[in-house]
Structure formats: C-alpha cells, structure tokens
C-alpha cells in the first residue's frame, strides 16, 4: 500500500528529524502513516463521520487499564500520533489531568491540523523524549500509556527494563502501565513480556482475534484480577465510557499463552549512564539502518 494510490487523497507529506509522515484520506477515513525501512506503518485513524470514537482496535484495547481503575485522576501518554487516545480520554473524563509527551513537533502540528486535537488546561503536550520526561517530571500517575513509535521500529531506550523501572517509580500505589506491543508483525513480544515481568509482578495481555493489536497492562500489585471480577465490575465504569465501547469484548480479548508466553531474555539498556542523551538522540532519529534494535515488520 502506498499513499500515492489513486484511491487515496494525500493531505500532507512532511519529513522531520524523526519521521517521514503522511496524512491521507479515503472516503470518511483520515489516517497518519510513518514511513520507515521502505514500508509504511499506520499510526492513527479517525472516522470523520464519527470523530469522537476510537477507530483502531489497538486504541480500544488501550483502554483496558480502566478495568482496574475506572476513575483515574492523572495519566501520562507517551507518543501522540494523531491524538485519538488522549482526545477520547479528555472527552469522557473531563476532570482528568492528561499529560502527553511527543518528541516530534511535526506530529503534534499535524494532529492539531488534521485530527481535531486541541490542548487545554487539563490536556497538555510536552515536546520531549518520553524517557527524559519521566526522569525529569517526578510526578505520580494512575496510568502510563506507552505508545511511542517511529517508522519501522520503536526507539530502543523506551523498551528496556531500566525504563520500565523508571515508569514503575512514576506510578501511584496501584498504578498501571499499558504498552502497545503491536500485532502479529512483532516477533519480539515474548521478550517484551519477559522484560515487563522482570519489573511488574502482574502482567495481563490483550489481543484481538485477528492479532492486529496487542496491549499489555502491567501492575506492581502482586495479586492478579480474575476475569470474573472484570466482568462483574464493568458497571463501575462511567456511563460516558461505557456507551462508547463493548467492554465485554475487551475482557474476551485477554490472551492466555501462545505467542505471549514470556521469552528467555529481556531488553536492557545498550549504553552507559553517561551516554544516555547520546543514545536518546541516536534512537529517536529516522532509522538510518535497515536493522534497528527493535524492528517492527509487516507480516507476510
């Protein structure tokens, strides 16, 4: 698939120090794509006939932490894309403090211009690397949503056990990390789960039947939550949230075993402490190599 296809209208094509970015439209669907390693990767989608709804299955799965905490007070979103998730949370939780970190100014500008993203006193965007922000901010969150991505890969310093420890320290007691592990094209998910479980005692993964999207929710709490409690506790979610989604569908997507069995190794920082900022700059720039440390490949 290419944005130049006759069935698509290219609304914007731009290049930043971090990404090659397309905004395209076909009928009612408007999408943001990143290009990397010669391929295109979908980042965000809105249905213009229903712009307040979450059009991508991974965004709907990303709301799974609300099954544990139906009334968060402060959340952090690392990676903006088109802004669908923070915009949705801002709408259904008007009192929520929602901080978003996006390293690429061009992505933020395109989200404002084409995807109806607007900031407010309770929805703020910080132009910064996600890990640098977590280290600097020193704030406690109910939920951290980790969704950083660039064309063809994930910045490696945002996938390691050291970063997960930093996130764990930024969570309130009982706080949750939700991380996007992508779909079947990601062959590194077993190592992802092993890395998460080396920091968080409880990790629950969700995956849709077509394996388009995988989201893991990690908690520092030792006790797991039985599915029966999820099912019986759905009524605790605000009506503003319940009317947008089939929450029973989310519960049914809890993944047991299979590809998400923990791997035998974990992701660790590949730099010394004094090299942190150099590693961040290297990992965030557009991929100069066809073999980045954490690649995402399209499935054949």
Where are these regions (language model features)?
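Acidic/histidine-rich helix-loop elements
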Residues: 37, 41-50
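A short, flexible beta-alpha/helix-coil linker loop
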Residues: 38-40, 149-152, 177
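Conserved beta-strand signature within the Rossmann-like core of class I S-adenosyl-L-methionine
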Residues: 174-181
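Histidine- and/or cysteine-centered catalytic micro-motif in compact active-site loops
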Residues: 149, 182-184, 208, 221
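Soluble small-group transferase modules, centered on the S-adenosyl donor enzyme superfamily
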Residues: 2-31, 35-37, 202-300
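The AdoMet/dcAdoMet-binding core of the Class I SAM-like
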Residues: 8, 14, 25, 50-173, ...
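Conserved class I S-adenosyl-L-methionine
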Residues: 182-197
């Amino acid at each position: 698939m290419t944005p130049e296809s006759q069935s698509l209208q290219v609304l914007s094509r731009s290049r930043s120090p971090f990404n090659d970015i397309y905004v395209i439209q076909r009928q009612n669907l408007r999408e943001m794509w990143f290009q990397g390693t010669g391929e295109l990767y979908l980042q965000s989608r809105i249905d213009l006939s229903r712009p307040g709804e979450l059009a991508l299955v991974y965004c709907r799965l990303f709301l799974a932490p609300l099954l544990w905490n139906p009334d968060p007070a402060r959340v952090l979103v690392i990676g903006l894309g088109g802004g669908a998730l923070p915009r949705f949370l801002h709408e259904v939780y008007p009192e929520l403090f929602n901080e978003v970190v996006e390293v690429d100014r061009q992505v933020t500008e395109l989200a404002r211009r084409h995807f109806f993203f607007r900031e407010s006193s309770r929805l703020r965007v910080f132009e910064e690397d996600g890990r640098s922000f977590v280290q600097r901010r020193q704030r406690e969150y109910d939920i951290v949503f980790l969704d950083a991505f660039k064309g063809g890969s994930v910045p490696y310093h945002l996938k390691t056990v050291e970063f997960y420890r930093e996130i764990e320290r930024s969570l309130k007691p009982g706080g949750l990390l939700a991380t996007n592990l992508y779909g079947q094209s990601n062959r590194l998910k077993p190592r992802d789960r092993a890395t998460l479980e080396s920091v968080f005692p409880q990790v629950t993964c969700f995956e849709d039947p077509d394996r388009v999207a995988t989201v893991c929710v990690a908690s520092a709490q030792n006790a797991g939550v039985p599915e029966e409690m999820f099912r019986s506790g759905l009524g605790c979610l605000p009506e503003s949230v319940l009317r947008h989604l089939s929450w029973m569908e989310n519960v049914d997507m809890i993944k047991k075993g299979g590809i998400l069995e923990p791997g035998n190794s974990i992701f660790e920082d590949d730099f010394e402490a004094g090299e942190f900022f150099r590693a961040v700059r290297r990992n965030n720039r557009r991929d100069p190599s066809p073999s980045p440390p954490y690649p995402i490949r399209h499935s054949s």
